[in-house]
């Protein structure tokens, strides 16, 4: 099962840097970053409720996560998404992420696609 594989790497107890977007008291989008290695943050748990997609909310969440990473002294963000997640792939490419070889636990996962972005001050 795809979910059980990913769930082991997405425990919320390891996510201390989280961005939440509220509309009328409801969380409509989220994202997080956690240290992957010195100087490198990994973007995790990007999600926008379906009825709020297409409003550039995810782009704003990603911008905040990148800004936060820079403020914390990191120079690069990496992330993984599913190859079939066309909206996510488009978001990451549109916001300056480039495809990289699958890293870490995703190295041999055919349905994973990994990205990287060098952050600019």
For every predicted segment, state its role.
Residues 62, 69-81:
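Conserved GNAT acetyl-CoA-binding A-motif
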Residues 39, 55, 71-75:
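Short coil/turn segments at alpha/beta junctions that flank glycine-rich nucleotide-binding fingerprints
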Residues 61, 85-88:
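Conserved short alpha-helix immediately C-terminal to the canonical SAM/SAH-binding motif I
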């Amino acid at each position: 099962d795809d979910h059980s594989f990913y769930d082991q790497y997405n425990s919320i107890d390891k996510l201390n840097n989280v961005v939440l977007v509220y509309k009328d008291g409801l969380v409509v989008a989220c994202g997080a970053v956690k240290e992957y290695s010195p100087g490198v943050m990994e973007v995790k748990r990007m999600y926008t409720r379906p009825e709020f997609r297409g409003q550039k909310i995810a782009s704003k969440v990603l911008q905040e996560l990148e800004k936060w990473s820079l403020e914390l002294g990191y120079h690069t963000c990496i992330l993984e998404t599913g190859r079939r997640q066309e909206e996510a792939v488009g978001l990451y490419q549109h916001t300056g992420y480039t495809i990289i070889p699958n890293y870490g636990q995703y190295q041999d996962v055919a349905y994973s696609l990994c990205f990287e972005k060098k952050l600019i001050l």
